[in-house]
């Protein structure tokens, strides 16, 4: 049976998802081919960010100095509690195996993943709790390589509080805007990641 419309809405920028999907597919394809160079070009275009893709130890230390001591103390308190709970929770999980019927064996085996990519919403608003909850719990779970990724706020880069929160456990902190799909998923892969807000 054919659809009959009483009234058909006109397509607008908000409702015409088809063209948006085509644009996003093109961006992702460009990033996949051009990697860091293209992602930085796209970040400059959309995010107005022209800084480094990977934050250096000096940039991380600089960010720390921009945060009031009271906020740092509160973040340490939260981090410690998140870590304590995550470790206690991990302690309640165990490998198990059982035979449901003769010859039908089932069970679970806990195997930590080798790498985790933690997206932290950022841009104009700092989501400090997202940084702590994702990065800290990954560390407690035994993940060896943790990458934290957050969008910049223009040329200011990542909010200093997000950098500080993620730096407690992440191996790399990153700051570029166009494509989270570029985030490395294993150690020693190309070291670049990005996200869009």
Labelled PLM ranges:
Residues 1-114:
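N-terminal Rossmann-like NAD(P)+-binding subdomain of aldehyde/semialdehyde dehydrogenases
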Residues 3-7, 173-178:
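Short acidic-hydrophobic, aromatic-tinged amphipathic segments that line or gate anion-handling sites
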Residues 26, 41, 59, 145, ...:
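Generic short N-terminal amphipathic or hydrophobic helices
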Residues 35, 114, 144, 172, ...:
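Short acidic/polar active-site loop segments enriched in Thr and Asp
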Residues 99-164:
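Conserved small-residue-rich beta-alpha loop and adjacent elements
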Residues 162-168, 179:
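Short basic, glycine-rich beta-strand/loop surfaces that mediate nucleic-acid
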Residues 169-175, 182-196:
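Low-acidity, Ser/Thr- and Arg-rich intrinsically disordered low-complexity segments
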């Amino acid at each position: 049976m054919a659809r009959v419309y009483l009234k058909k809405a006109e397509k607008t920028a908000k409702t015409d998802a088809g063209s948006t999907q085509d644009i996003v597919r093109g961006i992702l394809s460009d990033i996949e081919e051009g990697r860091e160079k293209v992602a930085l070009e796209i970040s400059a275009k959309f995010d107005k960010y022209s800084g480094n893709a990977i934050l250096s130890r000096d940039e991380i230390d600089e960010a720390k100095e921009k945060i009031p001591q009271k906020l740092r103390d509160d973040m340490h308190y939260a981090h410690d509690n998140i870590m304590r709970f995550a470790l206690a929770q991990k302690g309640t999980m165990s490998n198990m195996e059982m035979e449901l019927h003769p010859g039908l064996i089932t069970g679970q085996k806990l195997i930590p993943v080798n790498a985790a990519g933690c997206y932290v919403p950022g841009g104009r608003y700092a989501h400090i709790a997202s940084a702590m909850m994702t990065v800290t719990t990954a560390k407690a779970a035994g993940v060896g390589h943790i990458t934290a990724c957050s969008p910049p706020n223009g040329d200011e880069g990542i909010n200093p509080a997000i950098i500080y929160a993620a730096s407690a456990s992440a191996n790399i902190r990153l700051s570029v805007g166009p494509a989270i799909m570029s985030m490395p998923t294993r150690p020693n892969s190309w070291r670049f990641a990005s996200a869009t807000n």
